[in-house]
Amino acid sequence: LQSLRCMPGLHVYRPADAVETAECWALALQDEGPSLLALSRQNLKPVRTEAVAENLCGRGAYRLRNAGAERKVILLATGSEVEIALGVAEKLET
């Protein structure tokens, strides 16, 4: 996957759930060049449950959760690892 991200002109999308998959698909249809959607075969839980008019995947990255206390780490994830990162964030706050 990393080598594909280095290819000039190739847009690589790695959505975390069905909502992001739909958003990435819409972005891929708008792109002039080639696009790749790296999908998981896992049954992933939705990571975004609130309706938003903006295509957040178009930003490239966005925040899913704010820290409830002073931040000591920043968790970054894509694709199926987003669910894992959200679980880690929850455990770190307890």
Language-model region placement:
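Thiamine diphosphate
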Residues: 1, 29-94
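Conserved thiamine diphosphate
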Residues: 1-30
